[in-house]
């Protein structure tokens, strides 16, 4: 089941032009794995915190460019 936070994160990714590839690279996992989490097909413990942390790091780097 897809959780509400995943939709929020996808919206934020869209607004900041951050891709699944960006998140996957930051986390050191495959793009398909990130997609499964965001689509509710996987729910590993700590996923929300890890994905939001990676998102914030990427967003900060993009703002400095």
PLM feature spans:
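Helix-turn-helix DNA-binding elements, focusing on the entry/boundary residues of the two helices
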Residues: 9, 20, 48
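A short, Lys/Arg-rich alpha-helix, primarily the initiator
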Residues: 1-15
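Recognition helix of helix-turn-helix/homeodomain-like DNA-binding domains
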Residues: 29-43
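Short alpha-helical "recognition helix" segments of helix-turn-helix
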Residues: 22-24
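DNA major-groove recognition helix of helix-turn-helix/homeodomain DNA-binding modules
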Residues: 47-64
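Extended, folded domain segments that form the structural surfaces/walls around functional sites
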Residues: 15, 33, 47-51
